[in-house]
Amino acid sequence: MIKIKKGLDLPISGAPEQTITDGKPVRHVALIGFDYHGMKPTMAVKEGDRVKRGTLLFTDKKTEGVRYTSPAAGVVKEINRGERRVFQSVVIEIDGDDAETYARYSDSDLAGLERQQVVDNLVESGLWTAFRTRPYSKVPEIDSAPNSIFVSVMDTNPLAADPTVIIGENSKAFEKGLT
């Protein structure tokens, strides 16, 4: 076993150009089971089903009520399972940009929202799965209340992009998301 105490500084000279450019169009997206520690899915779709962005793909048997939704509209191409039927991925071939609709709130309403309204909206839309508990990085229970929330915007990988460039013109929306 290799143990690193102080990390590794790569001797890379220069810095990346801090611009955002369009990449090649993506044709397939997937939800990867490995990204969600301890999750046991109950599938709500099967191969060949057409889904919208935000459509329920599966729920977690271990974390009641947590919904995992489609990141894009299209057709479910594959549901991959490994040994002992361990969930590996759901692959969606992108086709169109249909999306489910969820409650939207105006800027003036944000400060007055009840906690339960926010939780319900996050769970229904599938965005609740973006939260992680510490130290095991699992998706939290819906009825749990955190002591604190950490928002990580700094990528520590070598030559990572500057977060101010990424947030850029959406800084107001970023700030509203933190309220």
List each model region and its residues:
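N-terminal, Lys/Arg-enriched amphipathic/low-complexity engagement segments
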Residues: 1-44, 59
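Short, conserved secondary-structure segments in the cores of folded domains
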Residues: 41, 47, 64-67
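Short, well-structured beta-strand-loop connectors
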Residues: 46-59, 78
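Short alpha-helical basic/polar micro-motif
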Residues: 49-52, 72, 172-176
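Short, charged beta-turn/beta-strand-edge "cap" motif at the junction between a beta-strand
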Residues: 56-65, 83
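Short, compositionally biased
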Residues: 65-81
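Buried, small/hydrophobic-residue-enriched core segments of structured protein domains
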Residues: 80-179
